[in-house]
Amino acid sequence: MDVLIACEESQRVCAAFREKGHDAFSCDIQECSGGHPEWHIQGDVLPLLDGRCEFKTADGTRHSISDRWDLIIAHPPCTHLSSSGQWAYKKGKDINLKYEAIEFFMKFANADCKYIAIENPIGVMSTEYRKPNQIIQPWQFGHKAQKSTCLWLKGLPLLTPTNIVDKGEFVEWIDKKPAKRKDKQSMILRF
C-alpha cells in the first residue's frame, strides 16, 4: 500500500507500516527525528493529499504516486483545535488561527482517498465537523496513561484494544480561588 502519514516528524507510525512492507511516507514541515530521511517528505502536505503527485524525500530521492494514496493517517496540530485552549479566544487570541486550523483539518477529511484516519484530542472538530468515530485511551494499548484521543475514520474499522493495562495515576488540581470554583468542586486532571 502507498501510505501517507501527515503531520508526523517522529516517523513512529511510518516505521510501523514500513515494517509490514508498505510504502509509507511521513510528511511534516519539520525535519524527521525518526532517522529515516528516505521516508520523510519535509514540506507542505496539502499538494500531496489527493495523490497523483511527485515529491522528493529528505534524502533527495524523487518519488511519484500514480494514483490516489491507499491510506492517509493525519495528526493535524491540535494547538487551535483542542478544548483545552479554547478559553484563550475569549481573552483576545486571534480567532483566525482557529478557523485556519479547522480548514486544515478538513483538507484531510475531504481528501480523495478511500481510507482516512484523522487523530486529534477532544476539541472543536466534534461540533465544527462531526463527532469522532471513536475515542481511544493509551491504557487500552499498553501505556499506563489517560488521554482521550479522537479518531475520525473513513472506510476503516474501529480500533480494537490490544493490551488493556492500569489507567495510571491521576493528579488532582484544586483551584484555591473560591470565586472560581463551581459548587466547590475540585478540578481533576487525569494522565
Across the structure, where does each feature detected by a protein language model lie?
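Conserved active-site and SAM-binding loop architecture
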Residues: 1-191
